């Protein structure tokens, strides 16, 4: 709830910093991350909006806003953010992973597979990309290949299924 968020000591401290200096980009970004980690996506997006307004080339903030928008179901806006992050930093593994999730949620399975493949080339142990690619492969008709990716991802992180369910992906 909004009240428990306001009582969170980290959020309180960051909010005080932002009140003292509304352009404290690092406090805005950090508070956005905390909001996102607590499932307060609208508040996270607002803080990432402010971070990006101050620093339009902040690829981390663009990626985090992409991810938060994806989980919140704002898929077109999310895709724009991920594309911009990747334009500014090609092969940015976090943005490839996030864009894979956008494409998976929007039903663009071939694009999702391409993004997850690219992310896994950079970091072969990226569980979210492995699991996402498995789901995308299954939805694209490659049931056995998909099942293998999913099994490997679950072996690396048994919580991956719950994590994706929390993103609205089953």
PLM feature spans:
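Alpha-helical tetratricopeptide repeat
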Residues: 1-170
